[in-house]
Amino acid sequence: LVDADFLETESFMKNNHVERTSGEEMASLLARLERHIGSWLENDDLNSINGRRTEILKACLIAGENDRGLFHLTVPTGGGKTIASLAFALKHAVRHQMEHIIYVIPYTSIIEQNAQVFREILGQDNVLENHCNVDYGDSEELKPMQLASENWDKPVIVTTNVQFFESLFASRSSKCRKIHNIANSVVIFDEAQMLPLEYLKPCIAMMENLMDFYRTSIVLCTATQPALDSIFDQHRRYIELCPNINEQFKFFKRVIYENLGIIEFDTLIERLKTEKRALCIVNTKKCAQQLYEQLSGDGVYHLSTSMYPKHRKKILAQ
């Protein structure tokens, strides 16, 4: 009702000249995905990384036929959960005539990466990226996206935890416009372990409300599932989408941690210089800047939240 009021006012003020487009149907998007992954599905070599990813992908496609409800996708890092979760969501949406897929992600850097992957598979006009770093500006070409960000009238939405829960808890009418497009959707919480602890109970209560009264399915998608069972209703059951979880984690285990204790700054620099490929994460922006200045040269990059988002994108592209 709130969104209809806004849309009617907009239509009147613009003499019925509406610039909004809702994107393609879910069946069409599923067909796009199936064309993209068609050759992957032939790989059944479980001794290869791609074969393991295909096993998870196939399981998600099959699981899409399940009834609405709560799902977990516990996939180790490198297991292809971005495409696998999209495959489940599209199959599930087509099966139940659901209208939207909403990705809820804690970090804008992950949002930007995932949104780009989805655009490449599903087409630019079908994916809405909505967070504080997106500025559609006054571009006529991007006007439909700017308008869609007001009420999430696109088939696939990629957004933040803050944007999603504010749309449900805020008392402002402009935020309420999205609620009817959250209903009858598949909502995927990527990196679900990052849900803020101090707000966990109301967030879980809202998820249950969406499942019980808004024809919505919830997917908690992560490599490390948080212990949420005690917060959900005790009668609430979930379906795990990843096959043979323990086996997958053993296969994808490619990191060994070694505690070096406290080391001097100069020692760290010398250690980094001996490595062909290395990622160094430090506690402060200042320290990261100092390291970069000491190491700067071909193949050395500096990433920090003190940079503008466009600058970070440029560095990541390099």
Regions found by a protein language model. Name each.
Residues 1-42:
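N-terminal accessory nucleic-acid engagement/regulatory domains that precede
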Residues 162-165, 173-213, 218:
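SF2 helicase catalytic motif II
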Residues 123-169:
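Inter-Walker segment of RecA-like/P-loop motor cores
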Residues 108, 128-142, 283-286, 301-317:
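Conserved helicase motor
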Residues 90, 97-121, 134, 227, ...:
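Conserved Walker A/P-loop ATP-binding site and its immediately adjacent core
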Residues 213, 217, 221-274:
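Interdomain hinge/linker at the junction between the two RecA-like core domains of SF2 helicases
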Residues 67-89:
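Walker A/P-loop
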Residues 100-111, 271-296, 300-303:
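Conserved strand-helix element at the start of the C-terminal RecA-like helicase core
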